[in-house]
Amino acid sequence: MKEIVDAYFKKYGIVNHQLDSMNSFYATPDNPNSVMQQIVDETKVSDDADPGYFVLDPAKTGGHDIRIYYGRVRENGHYVGEQTIFIGKPEIKEASGASNQITPNEARLRDLNYLAPVTLKLRIVEDGIEKGSEIIKVGDLPVMVRSKICTLSEENLDQYIEKNNGPIGLSRREKLQYVGEDPDDPGGYFIIGGSERVIVSLEDLAPNKIMVEWEDRYESKVEVSKVFSQRGGFRALTSMEKGTDGTINVSIPSVAGTVPLVILMKALGLERDVDVHDAIASVPEMEPIIYSNIEDSKNPKVLPPNGVNTTEDAISYLEKRFAAGQAKEFRDKKISQMLDHSLLPHLGDSPSDRIRKAIYLGRMARSLLELSLGIRKEDDKDHLANKRIKLAGDLMDELFRSAFQSVMKDLKYQLEKTYNRKRGIKIRPAVRQDLLTQRVLHAMSTGNWIGGRTGVSQLLDRVSNLSTISHLRRIISPLTRTQPHFEARDLHPTQWGRICPNETPEGQNCGLVKNAALLINVTQGIDPDSVMEILKGMDVREVLEESPKKGRVYLNGDFIGYHDDPRYLVSRIREERRSGRMSDEVNVRYDDNTNEVIVNSDRGRLRRPLLILKDGKTVLDRTMIERLKHGEISFEDLVKQGAIEWLDAEEEEDTYVAVYAYDIPEKCPHCNSYLYRSMVDWVNPGESEITLECGFCHQRFNVPSKLSKENTHLEIDPAMILGVVASIIPYPEHNSSPRITIASAMAKQSLGFAQSNVRIRPDTRGHLLHYPQVPLVRTRVMDYIHYDRRPAGQNFVVAVLSYEGYNIQDALVINKAAIERGLGRSTFFRTYSAEERRYPGGQEDKFEIPTHDIIGARAEEYYKNLDDSGIIFPEAYVEGSDVLIGKTSPPRFLEEGEERLGPQRRRESSVTMRPNESGYVDNVFLTVSESNSRVVKIKVRSERIPELGDKFASRHGQKGVVGLVVPQEDMPFTEDGIIPDLIFNPHSIPSRMTVGHILEMIGGKIASRTGRFIDGTIFSGEPEKSLRDALVKYGFRKSSTEVMYDGITGRRFKADIFVGVIYYQKLHHMVAGKFHARSRGPVQILTRQPTEGRSRQGGLRFGEMERDTLIAHGAAMVIKDRLLDQSDGTVLYVCGNPSCGHIAIYDRRKGTLRCPVCGNTGNIYPIETSYAFKLMRDELISLGVVMRLMLGDMK
């Protein structure tokens, strides 16, 4: 169903889920019920006021009742009234005070934060009389690039170009180019301090959902029931456990210890024993355990004299347990806080919600006992129905909620502090705007989030366009990387079509860092009250009495009532959804085992689209497909018309999905061409008989249908199970799974044409392949990610041949002439920047050529390429330590001596090239920062020509480094005179089982000969037989082998050599960026050993294993040379007094050596030792342990 997939990507972008998430978060006029507005409405500043307003302390306002309203009014469980919070367009407040709208590229160039102002409407009510309202700015929030408030959104971009007198009549792509953007950039990231950062999606357990499992306790297993109760940003774990003696106890957050279930249910208002029994029991086998727990609660030892019988008794028991010895008022407050706020907060926080909580606890106990009795299995934590995905908007929700509450609390404090009866309330000066802004920016720039999570915000990977898209679609698990977590890392059946089965890192992150599949959608959530109203209209009744025949109905994990015919209810909900009368965000499932109807409408569910089947036929028909092709209807219309529906993992348990509607015959019955799915068109979807049309001869023929009446849905395209990166691999179904995982990792490291605005991007580092090519063997998914416009590789002519041992162990032999013609050449860019900072006291940095009187000034030749302003000329050649930006700064500290009275000498603080790099100055950017100080960015380029040690990889995980560069005249050649660009070792194929590599070589050979692209899409690519027939047709052997001759001797090879054309990727692991050696250089201050690392001109570590090899050889002097002379060898003077043995010191006044302990001055000897030994001795002395050195004559 290529047309449907085309329509999907025409409607939705590749990172649409992230954009939708932030669009629903931002408070814009067209989104009055935004997440931001909901947070404002739910924010509670103090206990004496409801959410949405706060009351100033009457003691500080002269007894006046002054209320500040910032949220909407709540009526009948709904918020009504006008929107109170708004977010504007991205802007920057210049040092002059003017506010200007900015573009993402300006933010990158000037190291700015890409922020939009947030304004809040506040109403002041004094003694019941409204004094008016005021709209004030409360801070700034980061703007997601390409979201609806971004400057690049269609409406905003038109206004920006018009305001700046830009050209008219431009297309969308031309407008984006005009403002310095790549038209194919997907967006979905933020710009903080000029750096692009992405909020990576987080996988978490579903809130408000009961989970039952077995847990190990002291060599025995106990049944545990848990629920992560979440409401308004507050999350609390309530757990229930059945002991070995049958007692059921509940753990409540915020209090230590456990509470017996029956006592807690009675404290919540379920006073009668029969009500407690009915709330728990579902089968007669449970009754003995329930009765036992009820009887235990009535034991006089629990609460003298008669045990717990009433709600008052239960409250008394809780007071005795958790607030013993406190005043009555404090006890009441403590228990109310525990029952109303800490226990199951998602069910409400008022005393009227206690009965609901008691019934919910009964349901938890029922699930626990069902597990104990074997009626139900333990819940699978790795099932996607029990997971929720937190997108950028959800994570920003947590951050904004915390920051906004801080702002409101601070506003209350400031108003109480500055209140003056005569002047009245002055809100604007009391608001500290930086509080919200800095709180959010700190989290965004460091990745440290609310709740102690780290790494939530990451620097966007810009190595290639593919790596960028992959990073934006990544999903990470919060589980610790050091633990095995085997089940969590494994593929789960519910991940089919939702999570890519191949794209995951190797190592400790394997299976915990995942990527979304191609056709996915993450629900934004809808108001459960609206769903509840519809369900009530379908005869869902909220009654306490339960009949075994009635089905229990749950909405978002919360029990809402019963229905007489649960199967009918489920079919009715689906009918309403498919007809468009109910939101397509709603998913429903009937659990046959427990007779439960589970309805979900919450946010964070990962869903995928499927074609709906009725009576073994698709609802989709030919008319819909034709209208889709001509753009008359969209993918969304197919959902509204009931042809396609989005299913979450919960509802998919109720379905029977067909993978294919039909099997394709090997050959066309009319033209005898080999057929494959890309070259066959399904003419009559929606009919029982299936008619196909051949893509070669356009003749039609019938095939039997594979669909049965039991099938409920049909896959749109099985190729959509893969993620973005794995989808560009041709013929992946012919490779072993680990190779696809490796290939996915390699593709993200490949160099190519990452962004079209590369010349004006000030990235810290970047790569550009000189001649990127479109792969000859391609997949359909490349069209959706615009891979042809942003390729990352080249087509190589490859011979599979051992060559003198130089391509052993995955090494590659490469043709020198091909390199000279430009094969594999790339440019590496590095940007250096400097700013004229201003310091307290009026001092500032200055761009200039430092003169000889400047402290630390270099020799004149280092400044030879600078102009008069201290900035280097474009296209100047620079090498390691050359100055790029001449800069002087005021002294760091006050200087001592006579010079303190004279003028201060400035110090040299120029920006220089990295020591091991060289290149040409590609670009010089001059701009100003937010504080109006000058900023200079120098972009240096260096050419990277393939050399020994550079890494290349095919799209099948066959990676290798260049082992030999051979002149063309010495390379083997075919009888047609074809000289390969690359010689690949045949031993790399058998054990790795990368048959796709061989098929791509054959396909590339045919594509080169015929001028047509070969389709290698997973499950639907051109078959091997078709490729081999094409080889014969164009004069090659069926096996693709050729006669080859040795370029050195001219003799024919005894074996025929497999030759083909395959797409190779140059990876960013290059020798020029890694090679390093030193003879002398800096040492560490503490240990006096050479520094570590290339960037610090460090030495190469001579480790323990290397030392052991020299010991084995008996090379004592070599050991001394490596570990002492060339490391931290030092001379110590030691007191020779037999009773002393301390290290001597040098007496400057007398010019002699003496022992500081015994005073000896004559008997002192030099010894050669490692400085690390002296350091260890000094540290032992600091512990009060002295090490005496005993000297002896060398023998």
Curated annotation (Swiss-Prot):
Keywords: Cytoplasm, DNA-binding, DNA-directed RNA polymerase, Metal-binding, Nucleotidyltransferase, Transcription, Transferase, Zinc. Zn(2+) binds at C1135, C1140, C1155, C1158. Its EC number is 2.7.7.6. It catalyses: RNA(n) + a ribonucleoside 5'-triphosphate = RNA(n+1) + diphosphate. It is found in: Cytoplasm. GO terms for biological process: DNA-templated transcription. One of its GO terms (cellular component) is DNA-directed RNA polymerase complex. Pfam families: RNA_pol_Rpb2_1, RNA_pol_Rpb2_2, RNA_pol_Rpb2_3, RNA_pol_Rpb2_4, RNA_pol_Rpb2_5, RNA_pol_Rpb2_6, RNA_pol_Rpb2_7. The keyword GTP-binding does not apply. Its cofactor is Zn(2+). Binds 1 Zn(2+) per subunit. One of its GO terms (molecular function) is DNA-directed RNA polymerase activity. Residues 894-909 have a biased composition (Basic and acidic residues). Residues 894-914 are annotated as: Disordered. DNA-dependent RNA polymerase (RNAP) catalyzes the transcription of DNA into RNA using the four ribonucleoside triphosphates as substrates. This subunit is involved in DNA promoter recognition. Belongs to the RNA polymerase beta chain family. Part of the RNA polymerase complex. This is DNA-directed RNA polymerase subunit Rpo2. It comes from Thermoplasma acidophilum (strain ATCC 25905 / DSM 1728 / JCM 9062 / NBRC 15155 / AMRC-C165).
